[in-house]
Amino acid sequence: VLTKMVADITPAHDTKLQELLRLIADKIEHPINEGNRRVLVFSAFSDTAEYLYEHVSTYLKETYGCDTALITGSIDGRTTIAGFRATLNNVLTCFSPLSKGRDVLMPGSTADITVLIATDCISEGQNLQDCDYMVNYDIHWNPVRIIQRFGRIDRIGSRNACIQLVNFWPDLTLDDYINLKP
């Protein structure tokens, strides 16, 4: 019964996913810093991150030829780069090659990850300032976590003139739907 009820809910009807795809496409087509097409997408949930990777990676590869990666901390990383060993360090190095020293760590490598989808397993202690655009696909219950996420790209030593941070806020009608009192 439940399967039939959700059968019509497809990625094409997922307005939040469609908005994310639109934002990423706009960023790729109109970089805010010349030549920088990188986007970091955070989700609080590994299932959501997997869902996003499944749909975002396919769209970006087919539409722009861009590579996407996934890091959740509970599985080995994944990427659309054929034959790439998607360890945490390899993925982060190819997503932020200048700050992570790709030329030193992976001499001769041209592997380049344009979009990284991740959980909070990388929200602390990672320098990803090659990226200038970060999306919170869902908001963590702890506001400090949001600040930590932003801190991955808003760092001293960034070559970006400006950065952009985007939040997807929960639907406010949800409070009424579940009878939540102010």
Language-model regions: role of each:
Residues 20, 41, 128, 149-151:
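Generic structural signal for small/hydrophobic residues in well-ordered secondary structure
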Residues 144-182:
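A conserved SF2-helicase RecA2
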Residues 43-46, 74, 118-122, 150, ...:
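A short beta-strand-to-loop transition that corresponds to the Sensor-1 phosphate-sensing loop
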Residues 49-55, 80, 129-130, 146-147, ...:
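A short acidic (Asp/Glu
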Residues 1-112:
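Conserved Helicase C-terminal RecA-like lobe
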Residues 84-95, 99, 110, 114, ...:
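Amphipathic, heptad-repeat alpha-helical coiled-coil/stalk segments that mediate oligomerization
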Residues 117, 126-139, 163-167:
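A short beta-strand element within the Helicase C-terminal
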Residues 102-111, 116-131, 151-158:
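SF2 helicase motor core recognition
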